[in-house]
From Swiss-Prot:
NCBIfam families in the record: PRK04125.1
Keyword Membrane: yes
Any one Gene Ontology cellular component term annotated for this protein: plasma membrane
Membrane topology: Multi-pass membrane protein
Protein's name in the database: Antiholin-like protein LrgA
Sorted UniProt keywords: Cell membrane, Cytolysis, Membrane, Transmembrane, Transmembrane helix
UniProt keyword Transmembrane helix present: yes
Predominant cellular place of this UniProt entry's protein: membrane
Biological-process GO terms, alphabetical: cytolysis; killing of cells of another organism; programmed cell death
Source species of the chain: Staphylococcus aureus (strain JH9)
HAMAP family, per the entry: LrgA (MF_01141)
Signal sequence interval, chain numbering: none
Lineage, top ranks: Bacteria, Bacillati, Bacillota, Bacilli, Bacillales
Length: 145
């Protein structure tokens, strides 16, 4: 007897590469229509996240390739490092300005991350608090009966 193909079974490596390549291809198309400049890789990450959350793409369809890419992420930064070395002339013209921009942007990023985390924690605690309050009220009502 032939075994039926299980939906939870991880897809073959080549199939996973095709899924990720298609997401990147679609994100490149979206990038060309965007009114503001945004990297296709960022659009692709958001698109893949939405596809995974909606169930249009199963985790098994991209997990193996995603893990492989994450494990070898250092290799993906080599071109960026080379372009920084090639731009040393530009960097040497205004080093203090660049260092200042890096410091200010890092501080702004930390502040924004902190505020977003606080908002998420408040929303999460309220929703959990409502569930606990409802459960206690139900238990009290059952105890009085």
């Amino acid at each position: 007897m032939k075994q039926q193909k299980d939906a939870s079974k991880p897809a073959h490596f080549f199939h996973q590469v095709i899924v990720i390549a298609l997401v990147l291809f679609v994100s490149k198309i979206i990038e060309s229509f965007m009114p503001i400049p945004m990297p296709a890789s960022v659009i692709g990450l958001v698109l893949l996240f939405v596809l995974l959350c909606t169930g249009a793409v199963k985790l098994g369809e991209v997990e193996k390739v995603g893990t492989t890419l994450t494990n070898n992420i250092g290799l993906l930064f080599v071109p960026a490092g080379i372009s920084v070395v090639n731009s040393l002339g530009v960097i040497s013209q205004a080093p203090f300005l660049i260092i200042g921009l890096i410091i200010v942007s890092t501080i702004l990023l930390l502040i924004c991350t902190g505020y977003v985390t606080q908002i998420i924690m408040k929303v999460t605690s309220r929703s959990k608090g409502d569930k606990v309050t409802k459960k206690v009220k139900i238990e009290e009502a059952q105890a009085h009966d």
